[in-house]
Amino acid sequence: MVEFFTQTTTGAILLILLQCLLLVVPLLVALAFLMYADRKIWAAVMMRKGPNVVGAFGLLQSFADFLKYIVKEIVVPAGADRAVYFLAPIVSLVMALIAWAVIPFNDGWVLSSLNVAVLYVFAVSSLEVYGVIMGGWASNSKYPFLGSLRSAAQMISYEVSIGLIIIGVIISTGSMNFTAIVHAQDGDLGLLNWYFLPHFPMLFLFFISALAETNRPPFDLPEAEAELVAGYQVEYSSTPFLLFMIGELVAVVLMCALTVLLFFGGWLSPIPGLPDGVFWMILKMLAVFFMFSMVKAIVPRYRYDQLMRLGWKVFLPFSLFWVVFVAFMARYEVLGGFWARFAVGG
């Protein structure tokens, strides 16, 4: 059996497919419960009960919603480009999913350990905007088109800042491999070795940029209900709409994973002496997701001009300055052992 999977082409392909399923299926199941948690957190802030009917404590509400979307009729607008219309949500979801191929959950728990994993994720996540643009253009309606234009401008604007922020971490680590980045944060001081301390300003900027990149409140301008009804998703229903929604959630969880890997030590234990493991990775991702949900519940939506001004006039200059600052500190070992512990990979 082992020889079949390791020495034959068919076995190798089946092994890759099995590995993909072992990654995608738990991720999609987790999304259902994360969506439930998101709605419960939002309800708690607004002093409501939230989902509480389907299943114990409403735990099966997300599965009921998925089933509802699947059995609904798919209504295609008159004059829509049918091929592009149906391709758009598929592109959006696939681009979000394939980025997970290089995300490690523990030592060796990764589908593909690339030396340029950071560059791969950045490139693939940049392609997600094409699904949004295709959906807005193919719908043959003004509101989806305006929403897709907003989304394209917003995602491109904040991808620049995210790229510069990640460059600062790469300079500190000397590698674009996520496993190497996590190992660079290992040490006898536990969480004091993690990059959230020396790169705290960039952690703050990365979190806000991740909200904008994934179109989460308060930066959900592409689907502003008061202005654009539902943005680029206006003319979508049933399964295509569900694919768009899942793609957005996958992108949000991906940003949570990136935040943990880059700034919070990945699967490393926060307390010296406790064993490292996937438990810490998942716990940290849940904590970051909780912050995403709280921002959605308590922060009002920005205006579009404020969003663009924040990205180009505040985040971009500051993140560029930080890259130069980190490079200078690492090159000349300023502050001696303190910065050297963080800025030259330990």
UniProtKB/Swiss-Prot annotation:
UniProt membrane topology term: Multi-pass membrane protein
EC number, as in UniProt: 7.1.1.-
Transmembrane in keyword set: yes
Gene source species: Jannaschia sp. (strain CCS1)
Quaternary structure and interacting proteins, as annotated: NDH-1 is composed of 14 different subunits. Subunits NuoA, H, J, K, L, M, N constitute the membrane sector of the complex.
Encoding gene, per UniProt annotation: nuoH
Pfam families linked: NADHdh
Name by which UniProt lists this protein: NADH-quinone oxidoreductase subunit H
Protein role: NDH-1 shuttles electrons from NADH, via FMN and iron-sulfur (Fe-S) centers, to quinones in the respiratory chain. The immediate electron acceptor for the enzyme in this species is believed to be ubiquinone. Couples the redox reaction to proton translocation (for every two electrons transferred, four hydrogen ions are translocated across the cytoplasmic membrane), and thus conserves the redox energy in a proton gradient. This subunit may bind ubiquinone.
Classification lineage: Bacteria, Pseudomonadati, Pseudomonadota, Alphaproteobacteria, Rhodobacterales
UniProt catalytic activity: a quinone + NADH + 5 H(+)(in) = a quinol + NAD(+) + 4 H(+)(out)
PANTHER family: NADH DEHYDROGENASE SUBUNIT 1, NADH-UBIQUINONE OXIDOREDUCTASE CHAIN 1
GO MF, any single term: oxidoreductase activity, acting on NAD(P)H, quinone or similar compound as acceptor
Enzyme class: translocase
Keywords, alphabetical: Cell inner membrane, Cell membrane, Membrane, NAD, Quinone, Translocase, Transmembrane, Transmembrane helix, Ubiquinone
Broad class of where this protein is predominantly found: membrane
NCBIfam families for the chain: PRK06076.1-6 (NF004745)
Location relative to the cell: Cell inner membrane
BP term (GO), one: aerobic respiration
